[in-house]
A protein has these predicted regions:
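N-terminal Rossmann-like NAD(P) cofactor-binding module of classical short-chain dehydrogenase/reductase
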Residues: 56, 60-65, 85-87
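Rossmann-fold NAD(P)-binding glycine/threonine-rich loop
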Residues: 88-111
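ADP-ribose/adenylate-binding Rossmann-like module
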Residues: 67, 76-96
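Conserved Rossmann-fold cofactor-binding substructure of NAD(P)-dependent oxidoreductases
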Residues: 45-59
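C-terminal catalytic/substrate-binding lobe primarily of soluble NAD(P)-dependent oxidoreductases
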Residues: 130-361
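Conserved N-terminal Rossmann-fold NAD(P)-binding element of oxidoreductases
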Residues: 1-2
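NAD(P)-binding Rossmann-fold cofactor-contacting core
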Residues: 19-35
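Hydrophobic/small residue at the entry helix of a nucleotide-binding pocket
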Residues: 6
Length: 361
């Protein structure tokens, strides 16, 4: 549900998956995508309860790639029709509401799929399990333009409302073993990867359910978004000095009208774990850069490929009957299992070097 950037990318990926027989894509208007043998498009207004229920009924699984504020409605219909539910939301309140629905469901409910939350949680929890005692788990993710000439050093590559939402809400974390919340845009740090300098700061949602899972088990756990240096200060100016945090609709409209959209982007993933065993203190890390590529004769951005691959891998695991009913956390899946999936391995494997185009031939 949702034929935006991620929805159409997921549909294109599922075309090559043996576990998927048919893909049904729904939105108000058909997107500009090639005709694919498995793909069936349906025009639906998601606020029309009757048509939404009719479309969902009888399907094996529903993926909501719709705006996060529609997910509660979609999840409720899935609960009613006993259809498995997955989504891409990073919104904490939406996830909490869906979790309540999942308590009385006999099918799988797995929100927060995709990149962050999503694959980053699978990676982080799997690294943490390699050490018997973990001091810290640091999750760092950024979707950045490869080239940027504006003052923000940023171009749009995904949903603007979701982006601004992450900059405005509180960030969950563990500090000295306790669950606390930090203010988005704070906790700024500098890091250098492959000779390029970046900044990272707290944003909302990316940690998913990891704080709940590891409270009392890991001393310090946090998630930060990676940007080019200087971006954070300009966002603080817009949100707090101009008080657009109380008028996010205006800020969203300004971004959509004036900030260019790019498909020439890079997704940066960096996870660092420090812990100890009987031999001493050890560090485990995962670093990956994902770039845009072509699929079905069309170019997809890095954020499209990384987000869609996160959910495609989860769907493959679900198709094998390996996900339980009710609410399922991302960290329920081990990285080794995720990297065995078709798209998990192609996009997220540290050794993946071939292009997406080569891999699907």
């Amino acid at each position: 549900l949702g034929a935006g950037k991620v929805g159409v990318t997921l549909a294109a990926m599922l075309e090559y998956c043996d576990f998927c027989r048919d893909t049904f894509l729904a939105d108000l208007r058909r997107p500009s995508i090639p005709d694919l043998p498995k793909l069936h498009f349906k025009s639906i207004d998601f606020t029309d309860d009757r048509r939404l229920e009719s479309f969902i009924r009888g399907k094996d699984a529903v993926v909501s790639a719709a705006p996060f504020f529609l997910n509660q409605k979609i999840a409720a219909v899935c609960s009613k029709t006993k259809v498995a539910y997955f989504d891409l939301t990073e919104d904490v309140e939406t996830t909490a509401a869906i979790r309540k629905l999942a308590k009385r469901s006999k099918t799988t409910f797995m929100p927060q799929c995709g990149l962050a939350p999503g694959a980053i949680n699978i990676i982080g929890s799997s690294l943490a399990h390699e050490l018997p005692s973990v001091r810290s788990l640091e999750l760092r993710v950024g979707a950045l333009p490869l080239y940027a000439s504006n003052s923000m050093k940023y171009y749009l590559s995904w949903n603007t409302a979701g982006l601004i939402n992450e900059y405005c809400r509180l960030s969950d974390m563990l500090y000295n073993g306790r669950r606390i919340q930090g203010k988005a845009l704070e906790g700024i740090e500098r890091l250098t990867l492959d000779g390029t300098e970046y900044e990272a700061f707290y944003t909302s949602g990316g940690v998913g359910t990891l704080c709940e899972t590891y409270e009392g088990k890991i001393r310090d756990l946090n998630y930060k978004t990676i940007r080019y240096p200087g971006h954070r200060d300009l966002m603080k100016f817009l949100l707090y000095d101009l008080n657009l945090i109380d008028n996010r609709k205006v800020l969203t409209e300004i971004f959509d009208q004036e900030v260019p959209v790019t498909e020439t982007d890079v997704v940066i993933i960096y996870v660092n774990v420090v812990g100890q065993d009987h031999e001493g203190i050890h560090q485990r890390s995962f670093a990956k850069k994902i770039y845009g590529d072509h699929l079905n004769g069309r170019r997809y951005s890095a954020i499209q490929l990384s987000t869609a691959a996160g959910i495609a891998g989860v769907l493959e695991i679900f198709s094998k009957g390996k996900l339980r009913s009710g609410f399922v956390k991302q960290e329920f899946i081990h990285l080794k299992e995720f990297l065995k999936t078709q798209w998990g391995s192609r996009i997220y494997s540290p050794d993946a070097g071939a292009s997406v185009t080569d891999l699907v031939r």
